Amino acid sequence: MTSLKQQPPHLLRGIPLAVRNLKKAFGTREVLKDIDLHIPAGQFVAIVGRSGCGKSTLLRLLAGLDKPTEGQLLAGSAPLDDAREDTRLMFQEARLLPWKKIIDNVGLGLSGDWRAQALEALEAVGLAERANEWPAALSGGQKQRVALARALIHKPRLLLLDEPLGALDALTRIEMQQLIEKLWHQYGFTVLLVTHDVSEAVAIADRVILIEEGQIGLDLLVDLPRPRVRGSHRLAALEAEVLNRVLALPGSPPDPEPFSPLPTQLRWAN
């Protein structure tokens, strides 16, 4: 297996995405409506919106965990399905197997001589020295670092993040944001982050997309230099622009986004 550090630049470059006339319905309920979106290779995009607006459904469609009712998902000019080996998804829960050591969780499903690659991935997230420990010995933030290493070992060109930091305390969350931003800058993959935290979105993303009732309500470019100064008036102004748009809509208790697990996901249902 080739080292992450030895990868040719063209393999580390992110996947360009195109979403065309995307619709997703569950029965009579239309969750996504005519989504059109172009994401250049290597862009860091944050997707925000009220609970139940359709943002996690969009990520599941991009991950191949569900199929659109109508529309196209493209990686460049090819179907996104052709890029599944280059795509990895992280959830809010790390989903580590407690009966496997940390290094074995990182190399889960791989064959051949993968241990050196697993150690390198753990080194990238700052946990190489914990490789032979059990997941139970880790904090919540450390478990998410292992989940991130498990994605990195596959050398993704598209990284999909479904609120992976939502359960972390404030300081650990900022540390994870900085780590994800560092790895994105280092490896050049395309990132889509679903988050409820607007301040998080404007702090680390190139672009913030607001989903409103299944449609794109706002597409905001975050044209600020990195590293960004948290608490700056420029970040605060961008955050206020997004929040003002969200709060301008009448609030109503949303229905949860429908979820139909694939057979391979049923083991996580409990």
Swiss-Prot record:
Residues in ABC transporter domain copies: 17-238
One Gene Ontology CC term in the entry: plasma membrane
Membrane topology: Peripheral membrane protein
Entries under InterPro entries matching the protein: AAA+_ATPase, ABC_transporter-like_ATP-bd, ABC_transporter-like_CS, ABC_transporter_ATP-bind, P-loop_NTPase
Chain sites annotated for binding ATP: 49-56
Any one GO molecular function term: ATP binding
UniProt KW Amino-acid biosynthesis keyword: no
This protein's record includes keyword Cell inner membrane: yes
EC primary class: translocase
Keywords: ATP-binding, Cell inner membrane, Cell membrane, Membrane, Nucleotide-binding, Translocase, Transport
Catalysis: reaction(s): ATP + H2O + aliphatic sulfonate-[sulfonate-binding protein]Side 1 = ADP + phosphate + aliphatic sulfonateSide 2 + [sulfonate-binding protein]Side 1
Compartment list: Cell inner membrane
The EC number(s) this enzyme carries: 7.6.2.14
Disulfide bonding pattern of the chain: none
Function: Part of the ABC transporter complex SsuABC involved in aliphatic sulfonates import. Responsible for energy coupling to the transport system.
Record-stated family: Belongs to the ABC transporter superfamily. Aliphatic sulfonates importer (TC 3.A.1.17.2) family.
Summary of subunit composition and partner proteins: The complex is composed of two ATP-binding proteins (SsuB), two transmembrane proteins (SsuC) and a solute-binding protein (SsuA).
Name used for this protein in its record: Aliphatic sulfonates import ATP-binding protein SsuB 3
Gene: ssuB3
